[in-house]
Amino acid sequence: MSDFVNAISEAVKAGLSADWVTMGTSIADALAKGADFILGFFN
């Protein structure tokens, strides 16, 4: 779960500094980590 929080934090920091490429990749990373976390409950 901490990886998910870190990915969200990176996306927010990138957004605040208008680093759109980093923000986009951080959001994608957060979504992937969140999906992995949720799917972990079903395995």
UniProtKB/Swiss-Prot annotation:
Q: Keywords in UniProt for this one?
A: Cytolysis, Formylation, Hemolysis, Secreted, Toxin, Virulence
Q: Kindly list the positions at which N-formylmethionine occurs in this protein.
A: M1
* Main localization of the protein described in the UniProt heading: secreted
Q: List the disulfide bonds.
A: none
Q: Extract one GO cellular component term from the record.
A: extracellular region
Annotated family: Belongs to the staphylococcal hemolytic protein family.
What is the name attached to this protein's record?
Hemolysin H3C
Q: What is the lineage of its organism?
A: Bacteria, Bacillati, Bacillota, Bacilli, Bacillales
